[in-house]
Amino acid sequence: MSQVHFEIFRQQGKSGGGWSLVEAMENREAALDRARLMLEEGQAAAVRVVKETYQSSTGDYMSLTIFEGGHTEVKKKNKKVEDIASFTPCFKPDDLYSYHARMTMTRILGEWLGRQKLTVTELMHSASALEKFEATGTTYQHAVQKVAVAQAAESESSVAQIVKQLNDLCTTAIHRVYKDERRKLFAELEPGQFGPLATKLGANPDARYVLNGSLAKYLGHAKTWDAKLQRLLVLMEELPAEGPGRALLLTAIDTLVAEMLNGAAALADLLGHNPDLGHALLNLVELFMGTIVNVADGAGGGINALARSFAKDELPEARAAIAGRILAELKGLKRLCPNSLDDEFKMLRRLGNQLVRGQGKYLSHQDLIAAFTERSRRLVTQEPLQQFMQMSKTSDEKLERLLVVEENIVGAENKRTLSTFMIPIITSNNFEDQLLTGAPIPQRLRRVAELQERVLRSGFQDVQKNLIAVALDAAAQRIEARAKFLASIEARIANPIERAQTLLKLCAAGIFTQGDLMMKARRLLMASLAKPGFLSTYIAQLEQERPAGVDKDQVVAELATQLEGIGIAPEDALRALAA
């Protein structure tokens, strides 16, 4: 997916239901035409085209609706407001430290936090960071207003009232940090001193607040995300053996690491340069699995120390953050390998093979299937499939390319969609005309049979599998009928034994497609077997070839086994031979 793409959404029914994504395209006019066509053909009650612009600095997309049409009037929503809608209202300063409040602040202030190389917990416990934040003015006020607008949409209070309430809460919380900094509540500590502090604080009601204040000071000396992560992980060595102090320090470290990993800027810096999203995800998976991560530019000390912690199943919140990030990226719109769909599919399979080994309490099987199904859905639309087939010169090559797609996507509905692209290729006149032009008929028929065999082995549902197989069989029948291939064998080879042996070899070599063509070949073969004197003549011929003699029953059994291998039941074979 390029830096800019256009998403087409539709709404079905006039009751104002939710919007569902139909397709993502790189061409603006093509996306608009597709949306208008859906309205004209009655495929949607309302449509919307959204321009998505990728911002490499944050790893996120900026959305802009460029077209809406249809009869259903739906209240327009701001995506950024929707992202904040789950924010639980805060009624006292302590509520600002809750998990949901911190996650909301991370989403709203992500860009600013990334530039400052801060986590939200550091910001909320550092007087110097809060002074810098207040000095921005607009960033602070915009954050408050965004939350207020989201809350006002779900309450009877006005935006102005909620802004005032949030400003009062934030001011109280900020001034508390300033006051505690002045009275030196947050000790400036070095490694080796945090364990004793955690033990001392124990079950104190303000223990987490005080410890985080000291951790924020300690991390303030780190100039890079890697240095910050390494400084945190060093503290794992001084965890108290047991008791409230151990849980206190471990949870504080885990939370700070998780916040780093939830930030796009921090994670990108920790993983180093990657050529594309696919390779970045591979590194994420390696990290999640607790194996060595190959980070460019000689960095990676922090990320590999974290991998070692994950290998010991430590830091569950941080590991869950990585799992969530992997799933989010898999479900996202950005291509794994933008320059090549072949590489895209290889990368998708590679990621799948690794993640299967990692499923468990952090990554469920259902979540993985849902993520891969969502990504697969974006690959079975017109634009990527046409791009994937553009190097194919003939229709059979296009069909083969689509079978490669089938092998690398997940989801029954996605495979059903893919089958709708395959049937028209097979039923087109070009399919037979372009199929190994100039090659001998057996070679052309074998090519169709090989494609059919791949379809029958595929993961298509039985309905789609049978439809494609029947279409290929029909194409093979037309090729055979046009060349009068079987008729020529019957006319050219008068000897029933030679004719039967020829047909048996052709069937065993996979020349004929399963279905009507194979049945036609079997009927011709059975007719040869049923010729008077076939068996006695066949045995006499074998006796000439084998001076040691032959056993009649053994000959019949061998022949029946060969015939069973091409789908003729032993009883039918024996009946024909006895004629």
Model-based region annotation:
Residues M1, R36-E41:
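Short linear motifs in intrinsically disordered
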Residues M1-S20:
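Short aromatic-glycine-(Arg/Gly/Cys) micro-motifs in beta-strand/loop hairpins
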Residues Q11-K14, R28, E52-Y54:
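Generic structural motif
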Residues S15-V22, S56-Y61:
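Surface-exposed loop/edge segments in extracytoplasmic proteins
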Residues S20-E26, E41-Q43:
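Phosphoinositide-binding peripheral membrane targeting modules
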Residues N27-L37:
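Charged, amphipathic alpha-helical segments
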Residues E40-L123:
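Short, mixed-charge low-complexity intrinsically disordered segments
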